[in-house]
């Protein structure tokens, strides 16, 4: 919004040229989202408390968590407000990637809000049924996947629908340009062509998978938000590189016109996340709930797809991956042993993984900070793929 205003008034005031610089707008988006979160945080927490949207704690979880029962949840709305205002103020609103990321983020946020609402109203820690939640995630994920298959391929925003129709007329067999290939980290001249169907399937699983992985990780005070900020910031760097014809050429990456604007979104997400951490750090005054976790995970997955860094997201989001795998392995092993031996057995003391470490003697703050450190190391490793190719 401010970019369009600055471009309109630039002839009358040359200092407004500053607003056209992507890096300046990214910094301002961070400050704006951070300021909104810090200022509005107490009001949001107070309103959530008045609405009696207290967290229902699992009775089969660690006993130390029982004291958290009643802590306001659905605090993810504070993050989404900061992201929305900062992105709309400082982003280029003609950019197609900004809008698709916002659509996925807030679409998944609505799903999470409904899930949280059911948990609060019916006092059921499980919320929406897995089938219902997965259905709506799939609707949004598939829509985004189909759109991105052609918008990433098209250098300009004017022929996306034409490209889609050309694919239909080709009998759904048309390929995609090299910029839509799956990039392999550390290999500068090798990529895997996906085709339209491959792109759609991969994108769907990345977006939906990232959303659920972040949601599973959200189980301790401050645990998930810092990894989201770190991974989001790292993806913002990739977006800046991919969106620049100069840097992408120098670093031997495909140039994706318009992708650089995602730096604004990632910066807003970082600022909003840090503001939320102010109130979510141990002992938490508010929990983000599914409204925040599902939205942020979907956002990370969508940005990673646009900048063609799905594998790097897998690396940098290693904590999210480990948490998800711990649940999958725990459930699978329990079902297998119950069928084989007549009683279910567990691989871990409890899943997700952070609860296993809690029950192994780690304090909650130890688990959180150590997971942060691991994520920082993984993000630095992921960023190294920019040059080590």
UniProtKB/Swiss-Prot annotation:
GO biological process: cell division; cell wall organization; peptidoglycan biosynthetic process; regulation of cell shape
Membrane-related topology note: Multi-pass membrane protein
Reaction catalysis annotation: UDP-N-acetyl-alpha-D-muramoyl-L-alanyl-gamma-D-glutamyl-meso-2,6-diaminopimeloyl-D-alanyl-D-alanine + di-trans,octa-cis-undecaprenyl phosphate = di-trans,octa-cis-undecaprenyl diphospho-N-acetyl-alpha-D-muramoyl-L-alanyl-D-glutamyl-meso-2,6-diaminopimeloyl-D-alanyl-D-alanine + UMP
Transmembrane segments: 25-45, 73-93, 97-117, 135-155, 190-210, 222-242, 258-278, 286-306, 311-331, 366-386
Highest taxon of the lineage: Bacteria
Cofactor(s), names only, from the UniProt record: Mg(2+)
InterPro entries: Glycosyl_transferase_4, PNAcMuramoyl-5peptid_Trfase, PNAcMuramoyl-5peptid_Trfase_CS
Cell compartment(s), UniProt: Cell inner membrane
Pfam (any one): Glycos_transf_4
Class in the EC hierarchy, top level: transferase
Known pathway: Cell wall biogenesis; peptidoglycan biosynthesis
UniProt record similarity statement: Belongs to the glycosyltransferase 4 family. MraY subfamily.
NCBIfam families documented for this protein: mraY
Official protein name in the record: Phospho-N-acetylmuramoyl-pentapeptide-transferase
Source organism (scientific name): Burkholderia ambifaria (strain MC40-6)
Gene assigned in the entry: mraY
